[in-house]
Amino acid sequence: MDLGCTGSKFYETPNIDRLAQDGVQFTQAYSSCTVCSPSRAALLTGKYPARLHLTDWIPGYGAPDNAKLKIPDWQKFISSDTTTLPQQFKSAGYSTAIIGKWHLSPDAKQSDNYSPQKYGFDINIGGNHLGQPGSFFSPYKIPNLKDGPTNEFLTDRESNEAVKFIEQNQTKPFFLYLAHYAVHQPIAGKAEVITKFEEKNNRNGQKYNATYAALISSVDDSVGKIRETLKRLKLSDNTIIVFTSDNGGLPKVTDNAPYRDGKGSAYEGGVRVPFIIYWPKANSNQSTQSTPIQSIDIYPSLIEMTGITSQSSTIDGVSLAPLLKSTKALPTRDLFWHYPHYHRVGGARPYSAILSGDYRLIHFYEDNRDELYNLAKDPSESQDLSNSEIEIKNTLKKKLDAWLKSTSAQLPLN
């Protein structure tokens, strides 16, 4: 994992680690998909990607030549009849802003039709159809983000824009979606920070990616800058902070151990993510939570924590507020994933999955095959139990099939 608070001895994230100490860190947190666009849509709507029919990164790779199945005709935007989190807050009188990555528009030609402004954001700085920047150094080659001085670093620029927004709205409620393009490709970092980590590698005889470490450091610096701004403006005691990621780490760039594989895969390494919530009203006696949660839970949690009235009828996530405030256990539930696509980098082939208690079942559509793992005993998913735990496998498969039907999930085609 890439953070000090998740066990890294190489990456340096003192500000994120401090946020984890001051807030609540969830040690079994999941994104709603193994790739970015669906996870972001799920976070902003509280709905599973399967229900949204937005199930791959935009525009997606398509099926490879050796594909056995056809990809369904999936949707590359959030439907206009879906109420988003920024729309909820805007209706409640909040100023709303997105700074950074949007990646929920079909393409450049339709970017304006599906821009963040159409979904409740008053201010949009840098959000468009792109999933990654042209460069992390100015000129950025990002539509609707004015270039800064030559070689200005993108994460720093996004952080400075966030500080400006907070300062401008310090006397009224605000909702800020700071979606850094980091740590996405193209992996880049400031030269002096890269050198620092190269020297650290040399001292310790390690071979970590120093450039990636520098990029992570830029995000950590951003967290520190945001928290310092809130403290300076005396807003810390009245502000909720959520820190998470949209998918697991990129294979070959980072190490998701002990979890198997990474972004774009069917396994834990593709969907296990850091997740920290800072809420001044949370129970101060807890700093970690082992309850399994998913990014769809952010939507109902923020609605309840802020006390605004929800305008959305169907929400798949559950509020974490009771758990955070009193350590009251959440209702028992299963978590689900659906990816009817092919991913060139992570290796995923069309699959659906369910987490039920300690067990995770993955159904692969190409050969109608199931894999079953006990994550409590085997977090690295190295021992498939599908042939030995038949009853559990069948029970989970029935639950998965029922969920797919209830969400009208689009299945891969023969």
Give, region by region, the residue ranges found by the protein language model.
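C-terminal cap/loop subdomain of S1 sulfatases and analogous C-terminal strand-loop tails that border
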Residues: D122-I123, G249-D255, D261-E268, N283-S284, ...
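Histidine-centered active-site microenvironments of extracellular/periplasmic hydrolases
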Residues: Q110-Y119, I187-G189, E228-A282, Q294
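Short, solvent-exposed turn/loop segments enriched in Gly/Ser/Thr/Pro and often Arg
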Residues: C5-K9, Q25-K47, T55-Y61, I98-Q110, ...
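Active-site-proximal N-terminal segment of extracellular/periplasmic enzymes that hydrolyze or transfer
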Residues: M1-V24, Q383-E391
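A short beta-strand-to-alpha-helix junction
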Residues: S8-E12, Y30-V35, P72-T83, G148-E158, ...
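Loop/turn elements at helix/coil->beta-strand transitions in domains of secreted/extracellular proteins
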Residues: D22-T27, A92-A97, Y119-D122, N169-L176, ...
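A short aromatic-rich beta-strand->coil structural motif
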Residues: M1, F89, K101, A162, ...
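Formylglycine-dependent
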Residues: L54-S95, W102-L176, H180-E192, E198-N204, ...
